[in-house]
Amino acid sequence: IIKQGEEVERMHTPLAYLRAKIRSADEDGAVSVRQLEDTDAIVIHDKKERIVTYIYEYEGKLRELYASEEVKPMLSAGTSLFTVYDFEAQENGGLLQVSIHDEQGKASRMMMELKSE
């Protein structure tokens, strides 16, 4: 039971973090998904500060990178947040879908409606 609880928490925590991060930044046009070096990335624009936050998977870790709008992001430069496998993000018609997998291939997913579009 403890092991099962740890597995659920390990998969829930990254998705809860993403949900909170996106909700706190979601305003018209601020959140999108794009490819960085063939990797899905959630992109959050802070238009006032002209800062972009990228959230993506690199080398088995969910990472976060803050950069100026003018700087080309490098995946290796992000701060490691959580161990995840096979991170996928899609945005379609104002609906953000994210899935992550654990080391056994079990998927956890979330969907959020975005204010942006």
Predicted regions located by residue number:
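N-terminal non-globular leader segments, chiefly Sec-dependent signal peptides
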Residues: I1-E6, Q97, H101
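Detector for methionine-enriched segments
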Residues: M11, M74, M110-M112
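Low-complexity, S/T/G/P-rich flexible repeat/linker segments used as non-globular hinges
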Residues: V84, Q90-E117
